Amino acid sequence: MTDEATEETALLQDAPVAPLPLLRDYLLRLDSVSPDNLGQDDLLCCPQLSNQRARYASFSLLLLLLFREKKTRKKFSQNNTWDQWKQETQLEQWVQAIDQNIVRIWNGFLSEFCSAQDIEIILWTEFRIDGKGKPYRVIDFVTKHPDLLNDRVIELSLQNRWRRGPPLNSSNTRQYLTPRYDMLCTPWIYHAFDFGTQVAFLILLVLYVLDPPRPAFYSLPLESIGSREIILIVISISAILHSWPTSVPFALTLLAFIVKLPSTPLPSDFAFNLLLLSLALLLIQLYLPFPPNPFLLFRPDLSLPLAVLIVNRVFGTILKVVSFFLPILLLSVVFLSVALSDVFLLIDLAPAPMQTRELFLILAVSNFILMVLAVLVLVSTSTFSRETKSPWDRYSIAIGRRARIEFYNSVIQYSKPYPFPPPFNILYFVLISIPTYVLPHFDISTSFFFALQKNLWRIIVGPFVAVARLFTFNLP
């Protein structure tokens, strides 16, 4: 089997000559043993990789992580209580045995000297279950395993990759200019482009709602659409194509302009309210730990835990408290409305006694005060923990774990080679994504498009990356 390069293929230029082994047969062998026999060498070892220490360990770790994922996703039988309890007990035994072997293999790999490139290989090497399946990497499962998530070596490796990108192959004595040129686009730079585009969009949207177009009494179609409006529409489209988790404001902006074509949203239109809602959501998203965000630009280990703390302790707490008190609060408000009004639901009612009105007013105010007190109590509970070795855990272990997950997922998301950040991704969507999706249906090879993607990136995106890298060389 030969691995065809894709957009997810890493820039690590050290691929072995021999094809990498498949995982399918090894996973089937693990199903036939008990948890006590899981650590047998012949089950987890791949002789084909015996002379490649990093890939050998990567294969074994990925095999166990995939097997762990398979076991934990298995649904239990609900027919019999004893059967369900037995299955849960067996699952705990399996997970414990798998985790012990994962830690054993990882610590055994670290017990001997290994370079930064070795760590990259073990985390980012792609293996497939079968010849046509999607590739899997150890890094894809790090956030799902508690020991690997809190491992200091993995943390340092991902922080280094975030700032500098994947290392070049030190065994290759001939380093050409193009690999170094490609390496300029680190995950940090890629994210900075994303965040910069979002900030530019936010500024233009603020200018629009502060100074909307003022059409003349008689104007031609599309006359009020200027460069500002065109840029807002283009960035909205590119953000949606980019699949940002926080692309709702961009979709609202695009919808506002579409429904008003050939004119533009005006303060008297409902579409203008969509722009205001989009602006409010964008401002709120600046405080969320989801990329792109300002917390990933400088010292994520200090800023991301604070963002996660605020989201979990404040927004999460408010949502829980409101959900808890909402039924009684709604009833109190409804009863208060009935008591204060002589007409309710088109039914004439006699005025309620003053004592009744006072009671429902007291109930509504009391529920609101209880909600505020509950929020304050829950927010202040376990907000700060004792001093810890890692800055990620200075608020609490749970907050540190959640912050690491957000950071690691961001590193994975922005580690794609030859990326096309917005608005360049519109060009990528038209010239690369659509053909690679359509042509396989006609049995036409798409391998040419990976080379096209590289060349387009080097010509169009690369110069902007080089300039950005020059001005931010010492920042991250």
Task: Label every PLM stretch briefly.
Residues D182-A192, G196, Y208-S224, S243-T246, ...:
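Terminal single-pass membrane anchor helices
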Residues L207, D211, L326, A339, ...:
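Eukaryotic basic, amphipathic alpha-helical target segments in cytosolic regions
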Residues K134-Y136, L283, P289, N293-R299, ...:
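Charge-rich cytosolic interhelical loops and cytosolic tails of multi-pass membrane proteins
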Residues N293-E358, I362-V375:
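Pore-domain transmembrane helices of cation channels
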Residues M1-P179, I459-F471:
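Soluble extramembrane domains flanking the early transmembrane region of eukaryotic membrane proteins
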Residues L156-M183, Q198-P215, F298-L306, F344-L349, ...:
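Membrane-proximal N-terminal segments immediately preceding the first transmembrane helix
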Residues P166-L297:
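Hydrophobic alpha-helical transmembrane segments corresponding to the first two to three helices
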Residues M1-T2, T6, A10, A18, ...:
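Extended, intrinsically disordered cytoplasmic tails
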